[in-house]
């Protein structure tokens, strides 16, 4: 996962990351069907949809297009797998953890294949897919594998002749809807804790990027998870996504995506069976650079924080607040970084920025860039598409940005860095919190008092101090306000996938 300076830590026993392998340029896509009950199925409608390589705009393949009847079939399989007495329910907790470890082993074995598929489907650099996405996926499966036999209740002292204790039980059938920006990693964030706790899953990958989810399904079958435990239905939001969100036999849903769609998911969940909902939504994240900060570190982290993954991150540092004493120097260095950022073929090991995911996202970003120009921000570099490069956008930096500009208010989800100026801490706290979002924030300062004050005052689910995008499977992640609710990762994620049952037993006499 990303470290303080945008590099990657690997966690290998010798501390050395594996060498970057060559991508598999002519990789055959083997898995394109719906995965239910450990078998591959054609859609009941007979429809298919195409998935495209954003880098070349060429069609990769066609994938079976699921719909409500396919979701119903998947839920039926998941329910059967969760029934008392089923192979999955009879499996002890230690064995569940071993299956997750074995799944991580197979992901490690096929890491180059999965990274290649991710790069083909998303356009993200192979370097990042291999060292960030796949590394995080493997670590997430291993982390929750370790938790499987450690989920336990408590004995509760009472003032009566009873024994009182709690049981933490799996919820049942869990729905999951994953985004296109980190397809496999976000799948792992949802699948690993759900399986760790003993649930079954019906998952919809984003229609733009279904290929790694379907490949993972083949590994789930190879490992030996019982039929029906994991079911994957590719398709579109208004059909498959809506069917999962509103299904009366799905007991919990986890969604990562836009705030607008998150509202629809919550509404559908409420109208159906009041299923439990975890939402990880958008962000307009402040990155605060104080005058006493290590400017080299702050510039690099802010750069990686907004341009990583083509800017297509809910955690993007999309509002950089810089104290006025160092504002000019920060802008100058940021422009230098942006101009040097390698943009191009995502399979080239030197590339750090690939294309945007699709034409819709590409057009939205360019429209917001134009709004920045019209509203008076100073365009320092970039500001347009790459010539003759399809969906590629030049790394863009704006200075003299004010809070009322659209680029300072709206989630751009692209390679655009708006830099704002502030005078003092109280001012920047108020401005940073003046948003409907509250996903992440970052602070750069050498002063511990400032760091702690800002960490407490910022209305965000995560605050990074002198680092950015520092994710760990052990650390909970989620948002305040309209950035969502619930937590993924860490011990906190287990509560999202378990029900707490209180058991009280009457005794003849009080135990001492």
Swiss-Prot record:
Q: Among the record's GO biological process terms, what is one?
A: positive regulation of retinoic acid receptor signaling pathway
Q: Where is this region: Disordered?
A: 1-22
| Site label Transition state stabilizer, positions | 181
Location in the cell? Cytoplasm
Disulfide pairings: none
Family the UniProt entry places it in: Belongs to the aldehyde dehydrogenase family.
Name recorded for this polypeptide: Retinaldehyde dehydrogenase 3
């Amino acid at each position: 996962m990303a470290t303080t300076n945008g590099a990657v830590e690997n966690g290998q026993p010798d501390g050395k990351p594996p060498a970057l392998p060559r991508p598999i340029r002519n990789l055959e896509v083997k898995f394109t069907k719906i995965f239910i009950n450990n078998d591959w199925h054609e859609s009941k409608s007979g429809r298919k949809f195409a998935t495209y390589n954003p880098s070349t705009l060429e069609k990769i393949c066609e994938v079976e297009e699921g719909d409500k009847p396919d979701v119903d079939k998947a839920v039926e399989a998941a329910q059967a797998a969760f029934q008392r007495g089923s192979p999955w329910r009879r499996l002890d907790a230690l064995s569940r953890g071993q299956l997750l470890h074995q799944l991580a082993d197979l992901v490690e074995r096929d890491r180059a294949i999965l990274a290649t598929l991710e790069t083909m489907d998303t356009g993200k650099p192979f370097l990042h897919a291999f060292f960030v996405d796949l590394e995080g996926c493997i670590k997430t499966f291993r982390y929750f594998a370790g938790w499987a036999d450690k989920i336990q209740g408590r004995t509760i002292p009472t003032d009566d002749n009873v024994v009182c204790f709690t049981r933490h039980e799996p919820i049942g059938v869990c729905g999951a809807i994953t985004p296109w920006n980190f397809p496999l990693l976000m799948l792992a964030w949802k699948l690993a804790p759900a399986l760790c706790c003993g649930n079954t899953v019906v998952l919809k990958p984003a229609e733009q990027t279904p290929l790694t989810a379907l490949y993972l399904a083949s590994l789930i079958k190879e490992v030996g998870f019982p039929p029906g435990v994991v079911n994957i239905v590719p398709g579109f939001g208004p059909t498959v996504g809506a069917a999962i969100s509103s299904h009366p036999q799905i007991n919990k849903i986890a969604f990562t995506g836009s705030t607008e769609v998150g509202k629809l998911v919550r509404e559908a969940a409420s109208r159906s069976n009041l299923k439990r909902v975890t939402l990880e939504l958008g962000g307009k994240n402040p990155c605060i650079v104080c005058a006493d900060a290590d400017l080299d570190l702050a510039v690099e982290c802010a750069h990686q924080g907004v341009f990583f993954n083509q800017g297509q991150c809910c955690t993007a540092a999309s509002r950089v607040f810089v104290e006025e004493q160092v504002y000019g120097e920060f802008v100058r260095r940021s422009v230098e970084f942006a101009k040097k950022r390698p943009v191009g073929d995502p399979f080239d090991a030197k590339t750090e920025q690939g294309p945007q995911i699709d034409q819709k996202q590409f057009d939205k970003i360019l429209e917001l860039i134009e709004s920045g120009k019209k509203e008076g921000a100073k365009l320092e570099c970039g500001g347009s598409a790459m010539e003759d490069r399809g969906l590629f956008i030049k790394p863009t930096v704006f200075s003299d940005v004010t809070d009322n500009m659209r680029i300072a208010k709206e989630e751009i989800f692209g390679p655009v860095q708006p830099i704002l100026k502030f005078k003092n801490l109280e001012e920047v706290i108020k401005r940073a919190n003046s948003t409907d979002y509250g996903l992440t924030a970052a602070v750069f300062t050498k002063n511990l008092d400032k760091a702690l004050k800002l960490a407490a005052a910022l209305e965000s689910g995560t605050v990074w101090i002198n680092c950015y995008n520092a994710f760990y499977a052990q650390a909970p992640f989620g948002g305040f306000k309209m950035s969502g609710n619930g937590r993924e990762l860490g011990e906190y994620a287990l509560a999202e996938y378990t029900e707490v049952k209180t058991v009280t037993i009457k005794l003849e006499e009080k135990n001492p």
